[in-house]
């Protein structure tokens, strides 16, 4: 059975590179009818925290990536936190010492970086006197090779490696040792991970060989890069799933975009993961690094916002507002839906959607500085707004066609140019110069609200 794992370290928020690795593992497991395991690699005692662990789990859930075994739900091969498996690592490390494939190293008490001697016998006396003791793995001469699913045949000369620590003096394992023991005991069949782990692979394969265990199939995925073609980091901009969620990126759009980063997908590049799941093949992943394009992500997100059912978008928007701490004023349900319908055509994120919808939902909106300076301070502003108010008041049928006719008739009265007339009215009823189409904006606002807002702007004009 296919068994894959995603094993983050809880030392920070979930990076988009980690999310993409989790996605590829999850897709492979789901397509093959296998298991997706979540393991927490928290042996970095200084930087790891349960708070980060919970944030990572929450980000994965938001991404739509569920797991079959993990620290929160358990499973047949737990515990799923490395900090809860210390006795297991100690037992296996001591077995390597027994087999003369590893040995104890005793260090100077005053200078812990200074090795005093090595031994195959546990140095009780020195340990009791406070000397640091580690276990080192013995690197044998020769070559270590494996077939990478993406990169092909890989070979390393063992002479380039020195004996390396597998158990630290504090009783915690090092990464390369713990990951081998865990992957073997958890019966992991495939390891898909970033190519930054490629240099770890020969050490891990040596440990597999020392135990006489079969190694999993490895695939090392090229990293996500910044605009300067170096690994994506904070200096390029935001990198965490949590940030993009807070900015109003839909989870389905983020997963869509991350899948496009390196996976050759046939057909339309706007899709849900479920739509492409059965066509996923790890061998279709590119062997070249890919640049994270923030604008492309927004574009993909905008496509999804206009693609999904209005009720789904409404639910996503309300959930996002709660998460981002944004208040949604209480308005009529139908009015809210109509506002959402016309506003989603103009924006690419839920955050932008909130900004453009806000004046629709709040009568106490502010006027943009550009509107006031470029239009409201014009000599003809008051006359245009008064005429608009009168024309709308006399309008019996409130629909887009009649509204358009009314505004075009008004613009032909010679009060001002059509652009000035339209922008004066647009800003008067929303406070903004960029909105959905003016005619449909006024139609959705309704007659009563439009008249009140024109009067409000006239009063504002008289005070300034």
UniProtKB/Swiss-Prot annotation:
One of its GO terms (cellular component) is cytosol. ATP binds at residue 234. Disulfide bonds: none annotated. Its main location: cytoplasm. A motif ('KMSKS' region) lies at residues 231-235. GO terms for biological process: glutamyl-tRNA aminoacylation. It is an enzyme of class 6 (ligase). It catalyses: tRNA(Glu) + L-glutamate + ATP = L-glutamyl-tRNA(Glu) + AMP + diphosphate. Its EC number is 6.1.1.17. A motif ('HIGH' region) lies at residues 8-18. It comes from the Bacteria. InterPro entries: aa-tRNA-synth_I_cd-bd (IPR045462), aa-tRNA-synth_I_codon-bd_sub2 (IPR020751), aa-tRNA-synth_I_CS (IPR001412), aa_tRNA-synth_I_cd-bd_sf (IPR008925), Glu-tRNA-ligase_bac/mito (IPR004527), Glu-tRNA-synth_I_codon-bd_sub1 (IPR020752), Glu/Gln-tRNA-synth (IPR000924), Glu/Gln-tRNA-synth_Ib_cat-dom (IPR020058). One of its GO terms (molecular function) is zinc ion binding. It is found in: Cytoplasm. Keywords: Aminoacyl-tRNA synthetase, ATP-binding, Cytoplasm, Ligase, Nucleotide-binding, Protein biosynthesis. Monomer. Belongs to the class-I aminoacyl-tRNA synthetase family. Glutamate--tRNA ligase type 1 subfamily. Catalyzes the attachment of glutamate to tRNA(Glu) in a two-step reaction: glutamate is first activated by ATP to form Glu-AMP and then transferred to the acceptor end of tRNA(Glu). This is Glutamate--tRNA ligase 1. It comes from Thermotoga petrophila (strain ATCC BAA-488 / DSM 13995 / JCM 10881 / RKU-1). The lineage of its organism: Bacteria, Thermotogati, Thermotogota, Thermotogae, Thermotogales.
């Amino acid at each position: 059975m296919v068994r894959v794992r995603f094993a983050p370290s809880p030392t920070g928020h979930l990076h988009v590179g980690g999310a993409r690795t989790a996605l590829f593992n999850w897709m492979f497991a789901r397509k093959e009818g296998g298991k997706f395991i979540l393991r927490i690699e928290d042996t970095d005692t200084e930087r790891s925290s349960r708070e980060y662990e919970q944030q990572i789990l929450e980000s994965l859930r938001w991404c739509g990536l569920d797991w079959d075994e993990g620290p929160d739900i358990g499973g047949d091969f737990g515990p799923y936190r490395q900090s809860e498996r210390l006795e297991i690592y100690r037992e296996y490390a001591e077995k390597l010492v027994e087999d003369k494939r590893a040995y104890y190293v005793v260090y100077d008490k005053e200078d812990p970086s200074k090795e005093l001697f090595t031994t195959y016998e546990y140095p009780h006396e020195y340990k009791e006197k406070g000397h640091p003791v580690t276990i080192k793995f013995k690197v044998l001469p020769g070559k270590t090779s494996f077939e990478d699913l993406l990169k092909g045949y890989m070979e390393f000369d063992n002479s380039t490696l020195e004996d390396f620590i597998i158990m630290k003096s504090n009783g915690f394992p090092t990464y390369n040792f713990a990951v081998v023991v865990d992957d073997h005991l958890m019966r992991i069949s495939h390891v898909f991970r970033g190519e930054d782990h490629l240099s770890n692979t020969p050490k891990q394969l040596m440990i597999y060989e020392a135990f006489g265990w079969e190694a999993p199939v490895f695939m090392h995925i090229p990293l996500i890069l910044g605009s300067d073609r170096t690994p994506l980091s904070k200096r390029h901009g935001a990198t965490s799933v949590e940030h993009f969620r807070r900015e109003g990126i839909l989870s389905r759009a983020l997963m869509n975009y991350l899948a496009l980063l390196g996976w050759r997908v046939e057909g339309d590049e706007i899709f849900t993961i479920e739509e492409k799941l059965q066509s996923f093949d790890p061998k279709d992943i590119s062997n070249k690094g890919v640049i994270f394009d923030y604008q492309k992500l927004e574009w993909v997100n905008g496509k999804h916002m206009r693609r999904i059912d209005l009720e789904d978008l409404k639910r996503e928007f309300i959930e996002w507002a709660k998460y981002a701490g944004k208040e949604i004023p209480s308005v009529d349900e139908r009015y809210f839906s109509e506002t959402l319908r016309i506003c989603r055509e103009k924006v690419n994120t839920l955050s932008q959607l909130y900004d453009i919808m806000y004046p629709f939902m709040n009568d106490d909106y502010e006027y943009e500085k550009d509107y006031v300076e470029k239009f409201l301070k014009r000599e003809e502003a008051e006359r245009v707004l008064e005429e608009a108010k009168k024309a709308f008041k006399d309008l019996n049928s409130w629909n887009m066609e009649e509204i358009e006719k009314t505004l075009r008739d008004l613009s032909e009265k010679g009060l001002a140019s059509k652009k000035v007339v339209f922008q004066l009215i647009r800003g008067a009823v929303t406070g903004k110069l960029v909105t959905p189409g003016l005619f449909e904006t006024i139609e959705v606002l309704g007659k009563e609200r439009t008249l009140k807002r024109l009067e409000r702007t006239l009063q504002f004009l008289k005070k300034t």
